[in-house]
Curated annotation (Swiss-Prot):
It comes from Neisseria gonorrhoeae (strain ATCC 700825 / FA 1090). GO terms for biological process: coenzyme A biosynthetic process. One of its GO terms (molecular function) is pantetheine-phosphate adenylyltransferase activity. GO terms for cellular component: cytoplasm. Belongs to the bacterial CoaD family. This is Phosphopantetheine adenylyltransferase.
Length: 171
């Protein structure tokens, strides 16, 4: 990295939907780097609950007070190649468990083989949100009392979107 070059990082995920764990990661990473790109990765083999546009809107809503964060979308390429394309020197990954660590450690080695100039930074969220995942959140929606439960794990803007979506699907 050249002197006076902004320290840019990429934090990627499906964000379907964004959780408090994602928000924690974004908050931490944006304080560590000059610029953080939150990149929605499109996997055509994965069935998503929310459209790319809806996920972008939710991410914009929860990051609007972070001036150094921008939301982008990428597909059909490795994350490390995307990071290189946007001149990011860092990839930020969350570690929630030992299985996450094992997987991310292996990916870090592969990424290093593909782009040795890009470093991977691991962040570990606090215990109270470490087990929160988008898949878990989606699995809670529906049964009686789901709204109070889900409210604990997602940012308010995401919570409102989830309520509206559930209402529209059941109207």
């Amino acid at each position: 990295m050249l002197p006076n070059t902004p320290r840019r990082a990429v934090y990627a995920g499906s964000f379907d939907p964004p959780t408090l764990g994602h928000l924690w990661m974004i908050r931490q990473a944006q304080s560590m780097f000059d610029e953080l790109i939150v990149a929605i990765g499109i996997n055509p083999d994965k069935r998503n609950t929310y459209t790319v546009a809806e996920r972008q809107d939710m991410l914009c809503a929860i990051t609007d007070n972070f001036p150094n964060v921008r939301i982008e979308v990428f597909q059909n390429r490795f994350l490390v190649h995307y990071a290189r394309e946007v001149d990011a020197g860092f990839i930020v990954r969350g570690i929630r468990s030992t299985s996450d660590y094992e997987y991310e450690r292996s990916m870090r080695h592969i990424n290093s083989d593909l782009a040795p100039e890009i470093s991977t930074v691991f962040l570990m969220p606090p215990r109270e949100i470490a087990e929160v995942s988008s898949t878990m959140i989606k699995g809670l929606v529906g049964p009686e009392g789901w709204m109070e439960t889900v409210k604990r794990y997602v940012p308010p803007a995401v919570y409102q979107k989830m309520i509206a979506e559930h209402h529209n699907n059941n109207a």
